[in-house]
Amino acid sequence: MASYTEDTREQALTQLMHLYGDSIKRMCGVYLRDMGMADDAAQETFIKAYDHIDEWLDGEINNEKAWLMRIAINT
């Protein structure tokens, strides 16, 4: 496992949020049926993803969208 700077981790998270943020919010909205709660759940999803962002940067996560969706469902 490589060692990454905080800047690298933040850039990676920003990239994931840009690519998948809307999809995660929509899915959370379907599950929760409340857009305020869906926004909170989406935010929590990306916080949890950040805790494991090194795994994604190391290439251990092959399908980042599925990974994020699974985090959201478990949130």
Which residue stretches match the model-derived regions?
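Structural recognition of an alpha-helix C-terminal capping motif at a helix-to-coil junction
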Residues: 40-47, 51, 62-74
